[in-house]
Regions:
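Short, surface-exposed beta-strand/beta-hairpin micro-motifs centered on an aromatic residue
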Residues: 509-518
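Short, acidic/polar
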Residues: 220-233, 304-314, 376-389, 413, ...
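Extracellular and organelle-lumenal recognition/adhesion modules and their flexible linkers in secreted
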Residues: 1-217, 222, 226-230, 234-235, ...
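Substrate-binding cleft and catalytic face of glycoside hydrolase catalytic domains
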Residues: 238-252, 261-370
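Glycoside hydrolase catalytic-domain groove-lining segments
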Residues: 258-275, 338-365, 376-441, 450-460, ...
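A short, solvent-exposed beta-strand micro-motif common in secreted/extracellular proteins
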Residues: 521-531
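Beta-strand-rich domain onsets/edges
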Residues: 168-220, 247-250, 263, 293-295, ...
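Structured interaction patches on ligand/partner-binding surfaces of diverse proteins
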Residues: 143, 531-554
């Protein structure tokens, strides 16, 4: 996907400027016909040149290629993209966890001030003999005295190939201008209100709710905090329970069920009128499985019985209460149940959940898919996972992108969303938080993610993974300070909500019509004539054609 604007390439690696890293590493220059190379270029207009460098004879994972970055090229507080193409020699096969997997993770690092600080610049896992586009990002806090880019990562003996590596300063303002135009097409619609016989009457249209929900996780502690409840009820639409629905919480000890905490949170959601996502039925990562489940993990029959009892117990109790469920959390990063019960158990979880609560949308949910720098969690791997579940009869109803982001780059997020949209499944950002100590930069980072999500037609909602200092899983991510004051990031969030809310006023024209363009959602219109005032509620749904409403019929 080509960018709609030209970002600033601050450093372009010279193919002959590479130096070997490691005493045994040898570099050589090569050329390949560009017509045979991939043409994708995420967020920049450059295509592969065909000129690349091979690093052979590597004796260690840290060995590879390095090149000094032009002094003064990198500035603090600027978000940089790392772009280019990386490969490994044909025939190389990686081995991970005892299973043969094609490809090796290759990492790009920015080593600052003679290596005293190493900044992650992204990673890819190319298939041998094929090129993969790197989509990393980084940001520096201070002006560096020196900086160098290093490419490394695979085991000793694996030859690394690098082509057209660039460091690009992102232009967020230009990107935001593009996204505002895109948002107008994706999230708004022309509306015509008709009231015959009353030309010149005064009209006021107010949007009550946006059709794009924004939510937050909650827990039993924060709902006792008045400042939290005030921000949540005034600025957020949905909820998700931080821990209280997870299996390790509802059944920490075998047979000792605790649904009281989840029930209290559901009561809170009912009182405040907020739907809640069901997170999660299972968790695929070994470290997030409670001990008694691990203890029976070697007994297939016992473990399968526990899995089925969990599904029946949870969904039998709460059928119809949660519009969404994350079924088996983080399957790109964990295989606890599949390794012990077979790959089909993941689809079985979906099949049985669908039978018990057919009205709920059943989600996959994982992290790093949107950031472009986790070789285990690429959009392509996520799509492969989803297709495999569907072949097994799983009724996958949605895609969850957790959104635990650092230094987000809009075009990389958009590229992931574009790829996932090919599944025709709705996408939600399910656990958004932005880690950044500087509140002004945190606000900018938050805006990057929210604008990309809101402007993309595949995304149907965003849920924050908390927002209040002292009550979040992640440090330096709050929108509201511990004393209840709203910080820069929180103000930015409120401003975006205000920007995405329509308000129109004017008069009926000579044909008795009032026209406006508004965001999808629910509205009330007040028409004032000589005979008095009329209030009418209506909904603006998605659609390309203008929505024409006769005020006497609504």
């Amino acid at each position: 996907m080509a960018s709609t604007h030209q970002d600033n390439v601050v450093f372009e690696v010279n193919a002959i400027g590479w130096a070997p890293s490691g005493t045994g590493t040898a570099l050589s220059l090569h050329h390949e016909d560009p017509a045979r190379l991939p043409t994708a270029a995420v967020g920049h207009g450059h295509r592969p040149s065909g000129r690349y460098v091979v690093a052979a004879g590597r004796a260690d994972e840290e060995d590879g290629l390095c090149q000094v970055i032009t002094p003064g090229a990198l500035k603090p507080r600027v978000t940089y993209r790392v772009a280019g193409w990386i490969s490994v020699a044909s025939g190389e096969v990686a081995e991970e966890d005892g299973k043969q997997q094609r490809g090796h993770p290759i990492r790009v690092s920015i080593r600052v001030d003679d290596g005293s600080c190493v900044v992650d610049g992204g990673a890819v896992c190319p298939q041998p003999g094929r090129w993969a586009e790197i989509k990393g990002a980084f940001r520096l806090r201070e002006n560096p005295r020196s900086a160098a880019v290093h490419v490394h990562g695979p085991p000793a003996g694996v030859d690394v190939k690098v082509m057209d590596l660039r460091i690009i300063a992102t232009d967020r303002k230009a990107r935001f201008r593009h996204l505002k135009d895109k948002t107008d097409k994706v999230r708004k619609r022309d509306v015509v209100l008709k009231l015959g016989g009353a030309p010149g009457a005064s009209v006021r249209v107010v949007q009550l709710d946006n059709g794009f929900p924004l939510g937050s996780c909650i827990n039993g502690e924060v709902i006792q905090n008045p400042a939290f409840v005030d921000f949540f009820t005034n600025h957020l639409d949905w909820a998700v329970f931080e821990n209280e629905l997870k299996w390790y919480w509802t059944e920490a000890q075998r047979g000792q069920l605790n649904y009281a905490d989840a029930d209290r949170l559901l009561d809170f959601c009912d009182r405040t009128g907020k739907p809640a996502r069901g997170h999660c039925i299972f968790w695929a990562v070994d470290g997030d499985v409670q001990q008694w489940i691990k203890d029976i993990g070697g007994d297939r029959d016992q473990l399968m019985a526990a899995v089925q009892q969990r599904i029946r117990g949870l969904l039998g109790r709460y059928a119809g209460r949660f519009p969404h469920y994350d079924v088996n959390n983080e399957m790109l990063h964990g295989r606890f149940f599949r390794d012990r019960l077979g790959d089909d158990v993941a689809a079985l979880m979906f099949r049985e959940a669908a039978q018990l609560d057919p009205g709920a949308a059943l989600f996959v949910n994982d992290y790093n898919v949107e950031c472009g720098n986790d070789p285990n969690a690429t959009p392509d791997k996520y799509i492969d996972l989803i297709r495999g579940l569907q072949r097994g009869g799983a009724q996958v109803g949605g895609i969850g992108l957790q959104g635990h982001v650092t230094n987000p780059v809009g075009v990389v997020i958009c590229d992931a969303l574009d790829k996932l949209s090919a599944t025709d499944l709705p996408v939600w950002i399910t656990e958004l938080d932005v880690g950044e100590p500087d509140e002004a930069l945190r606000a900018d980072d938050l805006e990057v993610v929210l604008r990309e999500a809101y402007a993309h037609p595949a995304v149907q909602g965003v849920v924050l993974w908390g927002f209040m200092q002292g009550h979040m899983w992640r440090q330096d991510a709050a929108l509201v300070n511990a004393d209840g004051t709203v910080n820069d990031a929180g103000q930015r969030f409120i401003e975006l909500r205000r920007e995405w809310t329509s308000d129109a006023r004017g008069r009926l024209d000579g044909d008795g019509q009032f026209k406006f363009r508004g965001f999808h959602g629910t509205y009330v219109a007040q028409v004032t004539t000589a005979a008095g005032k009329m209030l009418k509620a209506f909904t603006v749904d998605k659609g390309d054609a203008p929505l024409v409403l006769d005020m006497m019929d609504i």
